Amino acid sequence: MGFCVVVNVIAFPDRQIAGDKQTAKSGILAALDIGSSKISCMIGELRGPRARGQSDLRSNLRVVGFGQTASRGIKSGAVVDVAEAECAIRLAVDAAERSAQISIHSITVALSGGRPATATHTGHVMTQTGIVGPRDVEAALMRALGHADTQGRPILHLHPVNHALDNVTGIGRPLGLHGAELQADVGITTVDHAYLRNIALAVGRAHLEPSNFVLASYAAGKSALTADERALGSVVIEIGGSVTSLAFIRHDKLVAAESFNMGGQLLTNDVAHGLSTSIAHAERMKTLFGTAIEGGHDEREMLAVPLLGEKGTDSVQHVAKGFLTRILVARLEEIFEHCAKRLASPAFAQSAGTRVVLTGGGSLMPGLAEFAARVLNRTVRVGFSTALNGMSEHQRHAGFTVLSGALLHAARPDPHYALPEKAWNALAEARMGYARRLGRWLAEAL
């Protein structure tokens, strides 16, 4: 399977992606979250029109199927054993199909790895008539894309993040406004070429076609952020099993994104090593007794810890809860210091002072929001999955924000995202009409 990496490969809303027509007509949608600790699938049914408002979309979307299995063949969000990954994907999707009593053929895939990188490029044009028209917006966007060097990395998301007209900035919809010079600032998010190919390979071997892809932290924001947070700007920090991802979202658009290979599994490994116990017992200790803030009674509260490889009455040691907390805090400080470095980078410069929302299974630890607020020097809260119709109470915690957000993305994807190979080939055959379709896309998107 080959992947196109030219800058101007963009999906248009008036062009149906191959293999997705049947599900689109029936209103059946599916999302897949390929994580390092678990692989989850959610099937939804869109009842009613794909309204423009997020609240309307949420009320019209109902979850009808769910499946989850332990991750296999995945390390740090990337495929390391395609046969094992295929098997795990099949198990999760099969469970979701059985619960929904529906067979699916295409799916939206959330991506947590691939070293996402964002850059903003600017294009300037003089308006043709003194009033901004679709061709002017198209020309400004093409100028901006002309400055982009993706270095062979496929574009995952592309957003016009800002417009300026005669040096008046902050314009969301420039069409129809009077002005001489139009500026378009375009945000581009790319991922590693081989990473995306291997994810698509594993999904394809499970007899599914990726209808589109979405960055995991961006999907989490679609689910966990409030309307005001999405509009005013917020940073999502998605703490997964092996990967922590950051996304700055403003005006419902992805402005910046990054990730690094540290997550909840590293905390579990630290506990196992520090307490000389098994991974399974370490995970249990972390889940039941882990906290990010030391309490006054932690040194007096003793925990029974089974020793690794020991049996009998002498196989249990007793340690103070405070010792467990110190193990966790040491690693949490490292994780959030990495986050702070990335938030201080030029890519996230516009996010200064905005709220941080923690998502992912790793964000459920008591006291983590307060701990993160101290390290990041920002207001922090834990975000929970949006309450879609048909979701169980178990699926509404922070560990399912990516999956539910990917389902929302499937219901109304951005008009520009990474494409499967068939759609690339179809676009390549119609390159002569590219500018005309791009103009129509801009009229709808802006």
Positions of PLM-derived features:
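Short glycine/serine/threonine-rich phosphate/pyrophosphate-binding segments
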Residues: 39, 221-222, 232, 241-247, ...
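Small/polar loops that bind or transfer phosphate-bearing groups
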Residues: 33, 191, 238, 259, ...
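Nucleotide/phosphate-binding catalytic cleft detector across ATP-hydrolyzing
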Residues: 1-235, 254, 264, 278-325, ...
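Short, charged, surface-exposed secondary-structure boundary motifs
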Residues: 79, 269-270, 389-394
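Feature representing long, continuous alpha-helical segments
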Residues: 269, 322, 326, 330-337, ...
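Nucleotide-binding motor/catalytic cores of P-loop/tubulin-like NTPases across gene-expression machines
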Residues: 253-256, 350, 358-408
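Glycine-rich beta-strand-to-loop/alpha-helix junction loops that act as flexible
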Residues: 109-114, 240, 354-364
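Glycine-rich phosphate-binding loop of actin/hexokinase-like ATP-binding domains
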Residues: 232-274
